[in-house]
Amino acid sequence: MAETAPLRVQLIARTEFTVPPDVPWETDAEGGAALVEFAGRACYQSWSKPNPRTATNASYLRHIIDVGHLSVLEHASVSFYITGISRSCTHELIRHRHFSYSQLSQRYVPENDSQVVVPPGIEGDAELEGLFTAAADASRAAYAELLAKLEAKLMGDEPREGRATLRRKQARQAARSVLPNATETRIVVTGNYRAWRHFIAMRASEHADLEIRRLAIACLRELVAVAPAVFADFEIYPLADGTEVATTPLVTEA
């Protein structure tokens, strides 16, 4: 029986920032948030912080977002390693073209023991989960049988390791066609702050597919911990059905 994989979002990289020694400026933040403020002040050379209403990093970044000067958010970035996500969900995720992606390859990695992600609409219903599990198991059995026969067919009398590696890839790329969209995949996603804000605004919405909405909420929680001045304006709240959404009163895209 196929095992299920829980969603996991792990922070693996974030922006660091060093103030140039010849710039007479300091701030009360660090990392990406400091870099965003520096970039904004560089446009106007406002190192002395002439406006007391934007003298702190948090107040400056809130003003930047509120007026839609979002380009400065593009200087700072965050990378996540995401597991327990379905192939169908990553098909939606990769439509966000300002992110960079590195995803598990089904040509190089055999999927005989792959896990599955139970769709939220099926989750918790014993009858539906039974049907889902049976279908997933049948797909994996077909994959294993196809893979074995394709490898036997393609290998032929070519014992050389280089050719054998190629033939195995060719067998996997053909056999994977029967794997379900619910097959778990793993992916590294890197995006700048502006791209992440856009993603959260689009995918943490009630109108988004529930699996990618859960992903957006999980990413948001990590992003708020990394750069609260940039992401804490998003409020997470529950809906009547027990799921969560996130919204912000500020500008998400100019």
Swiss-Prot record:
Pathway: Pyrimidine metabolism; dTTP biosynthesis. Keywords: FAD, Flavoprotein, Methyltransferase, NADP, Nucleotide biosynthesis, Transferase. It comes from the Bacteria. Its EC number is 2.1.1.148. A motif (ThyX motif) lies at residues 95-105. InterPro entries: Thymidylate_synthase_ThyX (IPR003669), Thymidylate_synthase_ThyX_sf (IPR036098). The keyword NADP applies. GO terms for biological process: dTMP biosynthetic process; dTTP biosynthetic process; methylation. Belongs to the thymidylate synthase ThyX family. This is Flavin-dependent thymidylate synthase. It comes from Mycobacterium sp. (strain KMS).
